[in-house]
Each structure stands twice: as C-alpha cells, then as structure tokens.
Amino acid sequence: MGIEKRKKMVWFWPEKHEGGVIKEAEDVAAEHISREGTMSHYSFSKGLLPPLGVGATARSSRHIKLRCFIVSPFDPRYRAWDWFLVILVLYTAWASPFEFGFLQTPRAPLSILDNVVNGFFAVDIVLTFFVAFLDKATYLLVDDPKRIAWRYTSTWLIFDVVSTVPYELFGSLLHNTIQGYGIFSMLRLWRLHRVSKCFARLEKDRKYNYFWIRCTKLLLVSLFVVHCGACFCYSIAAHYPDPSMTFMALAEANWKQKSLLIRYVTAMYWSITTFSTTGYGDIHGNNAEERAFILFYMIFNLGLLAYIIGNMTNLVVHVTSRTRNFRDTIQAASAFAQRNNLPLGLQEQMVAHLSLRYRTDSEGLQQQEIIDSLPKAIRSSISHYLFYEVVDKTYLFHGISNDLLFQLVSEMKAEYFPPKEDVILRNEAPSDFYIMVTGAVDIIARVNGVDQVVGEAQTGHVFGEVGVLCYRPQLFTVRTKRLSQLLRLNRTAFLNLVQANVGDGAIIMNNLLQHLKDSTDPVMKGILAETELMLAQGKMDLPLSLCFAAARGDDLLLHQLLKRGSNPNETDKNGRTALHIAASKGSQYCVVLLLEHGADPNIRDSEGSVPLWEAIIGRHEENAKLLSENGATLSFDTVGYFSCLAVGQNNLNALKDIVKYGGDISLSDVNGTTALHRAVSEGNLEIVQFLLEKGADMDKPDVYGWTARALAEHQGHEDIKALFYNQRPVERKTILVSGTPEIKPLMKHSSEPVMTHHHSREAMPPLARAVSQRRKLSNFKNSLFGIMSAAKTGDEGGASTRTGISEGVGGVYPARVTISGEASSSGKVVKLPDSLEELIEIGEKKLGFVATKILSREGAEIDDIRIIRDGDFLLLLKVS
C-alpha cells in the first residue's frame, strides 16, 4: 500500500534531484501514463497519451515526471477542485446579471456570498502558477515554473484578477452616476469558460449519457439567455426617467413599489415569452432604449433557437436512425422480392434474417463491426471466453493441440439464424463449415426428387465439414428448425492455420475418417472410399505427415509424400518417427519405403525407443529382420532396460528376439538391475532358467547390493532358489563386492512400472527418462524391484527412506515390526525405531519389562538395527 501511494506521489508531486534535474524514469512514467491521473484502465477520454515510438516516449519522460511542487492538470485532486469552481461559476452566472439589473449597491447576503466566491477564485489564481500546461505543439506537459508564469501572465491573468477583485475596494472612488456595482459584477461572467470546458469533458466521458449531457447544456444556455434578457431589459426600465413609459408599466402602473421578487418574476415572464416566440406577451418596447435592446435580443434568439433546434433534431434522429434504416431495408427487400416474383418461402427468409439482424444489433448480441475494430488479442479473448468449451467438445477437433484450438476459436464468427432459414445449400461450393452453439438444424437430402430430412444437428455438432475437408460440393441442405446460433469458420482461414500445424492436421483428418467409418449412411460410406482414394493419390488440401500415412499403413500415400520431399525422419509431438510407427504397426511396405528414402533405423523417440524394439515388442518378425538387415541395433546403453521391460511383461519371446538381434540380456539398467533381478521379482521360473542359460549372473549385485540369489531367498521362491543352487551351489548369503554400497533394508515406495530412476541425467538412456503409459507393467509396482526403484527416488531426493513405505504419491508409511516377550505369543506391532535402545524402550512400554537381548524368530541375536527389515518378528528377552 505504501509503494502504491508513493508511486502516485511521484506522478503528482515528484521528488527533485541534484541541480534541479529530474531523474529519468521511463518505466514509472509509462505506468503512470496508462494507469494514474484520472485515466482509468479502460477509459482514455482524459489524460495524456504518450507519443509514438519508444525513443519518443523516453525523451518525453522528463515532462511526465513533473518537478517539485508542480501539479499535473490531470491530477484527480486538481480535477475535483476544478469541479468545485464550476459549481461556483453557476452561482456567478445567476448573481452577476441579477445584481447588474436589480441592485444598485451591494446588499446582504449576496455581497457576502460574492466575496466568499471571489476568495476561492483568488486561491485558484495562485494555484494556476503551479499547474503544468499542455504544449499544443508537442503535446507534452510543461513543468517549467517560468514558462508557466509567463504563459498565464500573458494570457488570462488580468481577466481573472479583474473578475475577482471585490467592488468594495474601489467602488467609493467612482462617480455616483456610474453604476459601478453592476458593471463589475458582469466582469465575473468571464468565469463561464470553465463551464464550457466542463461540458466538453463530460461529453467524452462514457460514464454519462451523451443525450442527456447535451440536453442539460442546451437547457442551461437557454435559462442563462432568458435570465440575462430579463435583467438587462429591467435595468433599462429602471433607469428610464419616466417609469410609465417602460414595458414593466404595461403590467403594473406602480411597478417600482412592488417587491423585488415580483419585479424579477415579471421581467422573467416577458423575457421567456419573447425568447420562445409564442407571439403573445412579448416584451413591448415603449421607449427607444427598450426597442433597440429588444431588436438585438430577438435577432440573437433567432440564431440561438436555430442552434438548439438543430442540436435536438440531430440527437433525436441519431436515436431513431437505426429503426428508420431497418424499416427502409425491410421495405426495399420486400419490393425487390415482389418485383422479381421470388417464392413466398424465400421472401419470408429474407425478412426474417433482416429482422433478426436488427434485433441482435439493437440488443447488443452481435456487434460484429465493433468487434472487428478491436485488437486481435481482445477479439481472441472474447471468442475464447464465449466459444472455447463448445469447440473443444467437437468431434473434429478431438486430440489436437491447445494452440491450434485457440487459433481456430479466434477465427470463428458467431452468427444468428432465424427458424426455417437455409444455412447451407446442397451442391454449393464448400466455403465454410459450421458448429452449433444453440438451437437445432435439419439435414435435408434430395431423394427421388423430393427433399427429405435425413438427420438433425444440435449443440456441439458440426456440419459442412465433409465438403470443406474433402473439397467437394456440399452434400446436404442444412435448414434451421428454430432460432439458432452458429459458429462459422472459413475454409481458407482454416487451411492456413492447419498448414502451420501439420501434426494436428493429421489428427483432424483421422477424426473425419473415423466419423465416416462410424456412419451407417451409404452416402457417407461412398465418401469414405473416395476420400481414402484421394489420400492415397495425395490430392487432399490438408497438410499430411509421414506419421499419418504410417499410422494408417497407407504405403501409397507415404510414397507420394516421400516423393514430394518430406523428411523421412520427421517426428510427431511425441518424438516418434514414421519408422517407429510403421515398425510397431507391422507395415512392412512402409518400413521398406522409409528405409529406401534414408530413414535412420536407430533413431530414438522422446522415450528412447528405437524402431527395432517397436518391431520386437509388437511381434512383427519380418519388420525386425528387415530393420536388422539395414543396420538397426539395440544399443549397449538401452538393451538392459529393454530386457527388464520384456521380463516385466513376461514376454519370453521378446527376450529371445533381443538375443537374436545381438543384445546382451545379462546387462543391467542404470540402477544396476538386470533382467534376472526382474524375473526373480516376478517369480517367473521359465524366464529365470532362460536367462541363466544365456549367461546371466545370479550373484551380480545391483546398486543396493542385492543379488538375484539374495532376492530369491528373501521372497521365498523355493523353485528359483533350487535352480540357483543346482546352477551354482554356494553359501546362501548376500555377497558385497568392492565398490558397491552396503545392503539396505527393503523399502516399499510408489513406483512407475518401469525402472527409470537414475544417479545422473547423463548416465541415463533417453528411454529411462519418460516411459509411455501404454507400456505399464501390472506386476512390477508390487514387486521387490518396484519397491527398490521407488526407494532410489527417495534417496536421491536427499531424505532418508530407510524406514519409509510409500503409498501412492507422496504418502509415506513407517516400517513396522512385531515384538513379543515369548516365542509363542502373537506380540505387538510397533514402528521400527532408529536404534536398538529406542526399541528396548518401546518394549518396556508395551511388554512391561526391560529387555537385555533381541532375537529373531530363528533365535539369532540381533545387535544392529540396520539388519531388521519391515515385517520382521522380534523376540525381546530379559536375561539375568
């Protein structure tokens, strides 16, 4: 709050720096130009606009950051002072003519009020010397005190001083024959220029109705003229030697004996009847002075009345012009239809459309001209707010990027259609397609020469898209059933956007083809066949990618695109190339075409997968063989990961293919996990046996020191343990090799189905960075390696997870053990503490005695808390 207040003070009362030089503050100046003063965030009827150009704005910043004690004319406090003076001017506008005509000498309370008002204007004279002014040549605020003083002194200072000096200061010096009081009162009318400026600002202020501002201004001008006419004419009568030869005597012979109020009302009556030219009760001049004044008064009235009538006529015509134009348009359309003998239904459509357009414009529903005049960013924001949700649910745009969807919404035009109006005609050129926002339309086909309704489109449906995307005449006539709001998208604008988003264009085309396939209409089936033929021949206007052709298995289209110079290694938004897709789909001809045109057989996608692995996991042996013959390999840094994936899917054939194509399945991934580790975790004896036959090492530890043999013992896989023993009969204990960390207890943490965690980003293959959800393994997250992989995540995060068991994402359970005082007792489940001393204290609280020994279920003594695992049974004994 303090900062904001200080910013405002910088704008209005800026600080002065060394030598009187103002510090340059371009950012602050620009901010204050747009937000401070009396300028709101959305109104620029008041305030100072910056000049064009960045350099010009910088050069003018010193004029925006005003000097010390110089007030901006746009300061809201100064504007409030100005409004206060306008109210005082309204009083002056009445009092000055009244004192001139009806008073000869000062009389309370008017004289007191006059002096109070004069005091305020005297303060304003002093204040004006400290108010910056706008240079009309450069439109910059001038804050030099000398220039401000010179400008004011050489222009309006003398008038302001004369109109402010009280009459009492020098009235006694004037001769008795001079009506000094009234003359000096009239000098105060100089202040009326403030009212004119006030109304000029109000007319530009959108918060106030322009019609009523103009009417108020004209009314005040009329009242002021009538008031002045009455006062001037009465002054002539009051100073005429013979009171009986004046216009006042026509109504009352002894009019000078009447009260001041009666005389003022009488004079106002004659003045206003003369001003309004009613023809009865006009001021009748009985002497030469009155006749001369009335002559000029009535001539002036003629001009003023012409001005008032012209203004009022213009205001009324402006209000009714829209209705008049509507009626003229309806009349012209009806005359045209009748003159050319148009069908009655077509005439009704014309009139209904024009009537609806008038309603939408008059009710503010569709101000297209105003919207088109706005900047593109504002237009886009309006369209996004109103229509994004509807367009997002349209089948044609399912799966496209948010960027393209936003751009499409920005290009759409909202239109209203009355009931029974044709939106699209059969066989017309496909220039636009439409999305339903509200309402409903009938889709009409011509069957045996008769129009029949074959379908209906409602909110969120699209029509006309087949003609636009396939570039063929529209198939159906679309006619509204009731008042409907539609979004129209021009074909040219649509194609221009899709050209810059080739991948999204393929998605849109797939959505259309799937829609045609799902349709039961025979006509749509025929269109599907024609469209697919056009795709194969490359005759579609939509930009199609190699990935689109590969996904469809369309080798003809793929060949056409490659002949046109498409990059065989181009990728989609997931980093997958056409070769990845063709290999996974089993499209052998597509694979051949891509390899012939130079596609890289070892290119990786964003997940690190290569085409050969896609062919292997998809069981496309011919593609795998073809890729291998053309140089495709499973690289050393990823083969261990692929092997683990195959084991996780219990896919023995994939492991065999890895071996077949030169992969070493005994290698480990970045966590040191081998395929044998994974096979033991899955409990798959067949795969374990196969891996052992291919040279897998059962005693090779991972980064935690766990070997496959130790895992089999821990998980209780008796058949696997027997296989290991028969393969290599050694003592069943975990072997720590040099350089490996000490074995950590098992910890259960949430994990992705694949082991993607790593020590360093450089050491990790791309495939381990992001694993596709389509390859999730159902069993791994509950396996030992799933637990350990998640534990690795915890260690890398810097927090100790030795006793942590995660649940889902972010939830951590502590490791738990069962303690008992007797071997046969069921015991109590407690949280595993960090030391044996704490465990003994817990035993004292739970069991009621202080234990001196801690034994395992098998009777072995435990002397280190680190060898206790989650779920162990502990026997606490007190030995004397």
Curated annotation (Swiss-Prot):
The organism's place on the tree of life at top rank: Eukaryota
Sorted UniProt keywords: ANK repeat, Ion channel, Ion transport, Membrane, Potassium, Potassium channel, Potassium transport, Repeat, Transmembrane, Transmembrane helix, Transport, Voltage-gated channel
One of the record's GO molecular function terms: voltage-gated potassium channel activity
Disulfide bond sites: none
ANK repeats: 541-570, 574-603, 607-636, 637-667, 671-700
Intramembrane segments: 266-285
TM regions (residue ranges): 83-103, 112-132, 154-174, 183-203, 218-238, 292-312
Residue numbers on the Extracellular membrane side: 104-111, 175-182, 239-265, 286-291
UniProt free text on domains: The segment S4 is probably the voltage-sensor and is characterized by a series of positively charged amino acids. The pore-forming region H5 is enclosed by the transmembrane segments S5 and S6 in the Shaker-type (1P/6TM) and contains the GYGD signature motif which seems to be involved in potassium selectivity. The KHA domain (rich in hydrophobic and acidic residues) present in the C-terminal part is likely to be important for tetramerization.
PANTHER family: POTASSIUM CHANNEL AKT1, POTASSIUM CHANNEL AKT5-RELATED
UniProt family annotation: Belongs to the potassium channel family. Plant (TC 1.A.1.4) subfamily.
Subunit structure: The potassium channel is probably composed of a homo- or heterotetrameric complex of pore-forming subunits.
Protein name: Probable potassium channel AKT5
Organism: Arabidopsis thaliana
Lineage: Eukaryota, Viridiplantae, Streptophyta, Embryophyta, Tracheophyta
